[in-house]
Structure formats: C-alpha cells, structure tokens
From Swiss-Prot:
Its main location: membrane. GO terms for molecular function: antiporter activity; xenobiotic transmembrane transporter activity. It holds the Pfam family MatE. One of its GO terms (cellular component) is plasma membrane. It is a multi-pass membrane protein. The keyword Signal does not apply. PANTHER family: FMN_FAD EXPORTER YEEO-RELATED, MULTIDRUG RESISTANCE PROTEIN NORM-RELATED. Keywords: Antiport, Cell inner membrane, Cell membrane, Ion transport, Membrane, Transmembrane, Transmembrane helix, Transport. Belongs to the multi antimicrobial extrusion (MATE) (TC 2.A.66.1) family. It is found in: Cell inner membrane. This is Probable multidrug resistance protein NorM. The chain crosses the membrane at residues 21-43, 58-80, 101-123, 138-160, 167-189, 199-221, 251-273, 288-310, 323-345, 360-382, 395-417, 427-445. Multidrug efflux pump.
Length: 458
C-alpha cells in the first residue's frame, strides 16, 4: 500500500467522506443542542420558582457536571475501540468489550456517587451563601441516584456511535427533554398531586430522566436488528481487568483533558466574577454564545473519531488521513460561518440576552473575542477527536495541560487581574490557550498519523 503525498482533498473520495462525516455528525450536534436545552429548561423552572432555587440548582449542576466530565471522557474511549474493531472485521469482540465497559461505568458511577455524597457538607467552606446550601445539598443528594444510569447511557451511546449509528444520541436527547420538563415542573412546584420539592425536585426529575434514557437505550440495543449480531446482552461475564485496564489507559487521559478544558472556562468565569456583576453578566452572555457555536465542531470531532478509528481498523492510512481532512474541512467551514455571524451580529445577539446598557456594551466586545477563537477552538477539538480515533490520548493530555494551564490561565490572569485589563484580558488568555492547543494537537496528529502510515506502508 502506498500513500500519496497529495492533500486528501485531491482524491476522488474526499467529497464522499465529507458527506459521510457530515451525516454522522448531524445527530451528534443536535444531541448537544438537546443537552443545552435541558440546561435551559432547568434554569427556567428553577428561576421562576425563586432566586435561591436558581442559585442552588446552578451550584448543584456545576458540582455534578464538572467532575462528571472525567467518567464521560473516560468512557468515550469505547467509541474508537468499537470503530477500530468494526473496521478490522472483528465484530465478535465488540459485545465482550461493551460488557467490560459496563463494569467500568459501574465503578466510575460509584466514585461519582461517593463524591456527590461527601461534597454537600463542604459547601459552606466554599463560601456558598447559607440560604443556598440547603437547596444545593438537596439537589445533589437527589441527582446522585441517577449517576449509574447516566454512565450506562454514555456507555451505550459510545457503542452505538462507534458502530456508525448516531441517531439515538439525538432522539434520546430530545426524548429526555420531553421527560424532564413536565416531571421537573411537577416536582419543583408541587403540581399534578406531587409535593413541592424546590431544587430537590429538579434533582429528582434529572435522576428520573437519566434512568428513562438509559432504560430506553438498553431496550433499543436489545431489540434492534442492527445490533442483534453483537449479542450485547447475551450474557454477562465478570470483570476482566485487562480489558478494563486498556479502556482506562486510553480513556482516562481523555477524561482528564476534558476536565482541564472545562476547568479553564469555569475558573475564568470565577475570576471574572470577582471583578463585578456587570463583568460577570457580560462574560456569561459571551461564553453562552460561544458554547452554542462549539456544539457544531464538537459533534464533527466525535464523528471524525469514528471515521478515523474505522480506517485504522481497516489498516487504510489513506482513508484515515482523508477522514481527518474531511473533519477539518467541515469545521473550518462551520467556524467561518460562526465567526462571521459573531462579527456582523454581535450587537443584535447581545440584545436578545439583556437590556442593560453597560452589560450589553461589554458583552458585545467580548463576542468579538469569541469570534476570534472560533478557528483555534474548532481545530483543537477536531484534532483531539482525530487523535482519539488513533487511540493516541496520553500525550494530548499533557499538551492540553500545558496549553490551558501553562499558557491560557497564567496569561489571562496576568492580563485580566494583574494588568487590569479585566474580562478582555481573561479572554485573551482563552484565545492564546486555545491557539496553542490547536497548533500542538494538529502537529501531534500529523506526527502520529505519519508514524502509523509508515508502519502500514511496505
């Protein structure tokens, strides 16, 4: 097998690869949209119940989802493993691997359950206001019962995505929204014969939604002809530590990487919050818009993981490179559109969020910064997705650590707080951190893919 040195876009199959990746990514993007809408519904229900309820749910969801990034990121290694086995024609190994991933998800959920049990008593030491602590504690104690279902759900989701079937991610995402909205409303406000639980009610509704999503997904995988030959639930072996260890070796660095990136944005928000309510509100608007834009490259990156992994399993380095380049092409196009929309419509976008003149003025400027980091943000997440398809995760973890916490945070804090640039300085740090990450991740993929090509090419 020989690999052409010409750009993959010059090959006849490139347009087909772009189409395949795009179709694979679309349900994933919409699935992320459904997740964002769930957060929106939570805020609306809690906000109308009371300021203390909204604050409690905000604190509770932050303490749930930030550490939850580690198990979710760890389990995503299943996508590349399944995709590579599928590409290699070793589908009989997928069922046993999936069942070991279930054991891993059970262990990870147990750790999360313990975390959510021990954190609430510590909330006062974090400086949380006394009137918020009871609601946040009740929310966390309720939602923790859904964590096992949540990890099982992601395990099944990543299996399905590795098999090139992403539609359930979208359907179950919006299905969860249809469950959460009425149940959350009933339990929070005490409607339809239920007692009023406030913030705890939203935690209960979230846990119920998690179990409904996981149960429906399991039933679908059990009954669907598409997965029948995998015999996913034919039997359950005991834990096989070698297989679980392999999933951990590949997946844990992903979980840590995702945690470091999420931590960068959360710490940035906390530091900006120290500057004043106007600065905090403006930053929240800008970062919310940026997160909406990020859903597209994130979905494309997940699809690229699948396509790259499948090509690696087939032993086809040319297809692997073509899959990666297709992902880059889509992301560059979508990020160009996002950046253009932010540059041309930043004032109008801010107007949807607030009527406060001071907040709007600063948020409008920050959206210009958000437009600037569209390209590095898209490239870094796409490169990380392509590297996951190669099962190259350990070095990217250190690259992310350096980029976000060795470059982005020190520069942002130095400019924003040290030199008095305020939120603008913090956003410069975000841009530089993401830019360095995009360069290093891109170079790492180039190096790793070339090494893989050399091992396959005679």
């Amino acid at each position: 097998m020989s690999v052409s040195s010409a750009p993959p876009s010059a090959t006849p199959g490139f347009a087909s690869e772009v189409r395949t990746t795009g179709l694979l990514a679309l349900p994933l993007v919409l699935g992320h949209v459904s997740t964002g809408l769930i957060g929106f519904v939570d805020n609306v229900i809690a906000g109308h119940h009371g300021t203390a309820t909204l604050a409690a749910v905000t604190i509770g969801t932050s303490l749930l989802w930030l550490p939850m990034l580690v198990p979710i990121g760890t389990l995503i290694s299943l996508t590349a493993s399944v995709s590579q086995l599928l590409g290699a024609g070793r589908e009989r190994e997928i069922g046993p691997l999936f069942r070991q991933a279930l054991w891993l998800s059970l262990g990870l959920s147990a750790l999360m359950f313990v975390f959510l049990s021990v954190v609430p008593p510590l909330l006062p030491t974090f400086g949380i206001a006394p009137d918020i602590v009871p609601g946040a504690t009740a929310f966390l104690h309720a939602v923790r019962w859904g964590v096992p279902a949540l990890t099982f759900y992601f395990c099944m989701r990543y299996l399905s995505e590795g098999m090139h079937w992403t539609l359930p991610t979208m359907l179950l995402g919006f299905g969860g929204l249809l469950v959460l909205a009425p149940v959350g409303y009933a339990l929070t406000y005490g409607k339809f014969g239920f007692a009023e639980h406030g913030a705890e009610g939203l935690g209960m509704a979230s846990a119920i939604t998690m179990w409904v999503q996981a149960s429906v997904f399991a039933l679908y995988l059990w009954r669907a002809r598409r997965f029948a030959h995998l015999q996913l639930f034919a039997h359950l072996e005991g834990p096989r530590w070698r297989a679980i260890g392999e999933l951990l070796r590949t997946g844990l660095p992903i979980g840590i990487t995702v945690l470091m990136e999420g931590g960068l944005f959360i710490v940035t928000a906390l530091l900006i919050g120290r500057l004043g309510s106007t600065e905090a509100a403006a930053h929240q608007i800008a970062i919310n818009v940026a997160q909406l834009c990020f859903m597209i490259p994130m979905g494309v990156a997940e699809a690229t993981t699948v396509r790259v992994g499948h090509a690696v399993g087939r032993g086809d380095p040319q297809a692997m490179r073509r899959a990666a380049w297709a992902g880059y092409a889509i992301v560059l196009g979508t990020q160009a559109l996002s950046a253009s929309a932010l540059l041309l419509g930043h004032d109008a976008i801010v107007g949807v969020y607030t009527d406060d003149v001071a907040v709007a003025a600063l948020a409008s400027v920050l959206l210009l910064f958000a437009a600037t980091f569209q390209f590095p943000d898209g490239i870094q997440v796409l490169s990380a997705g392509a590297l996951r398809g190669l099962k190259d995760t350990r070095v990217p973890m250190f690259l992310a650590m350096f980029s976000y916490w060795g470059v982005g945070m020190p520069i942002g804090a130095g400019l924003g707080l040290g030199l008095g640039w305020g939120p603008k300085g913090m956003w410069v740090g975000l841009i530089l951190g993401l830019t360095v990450a995009s360069i290093l991740m891109g170079l790492r993929f180039r190096q790793t893919s070339r090494r893989l090509t050399a091992t396959v090419t005679p």
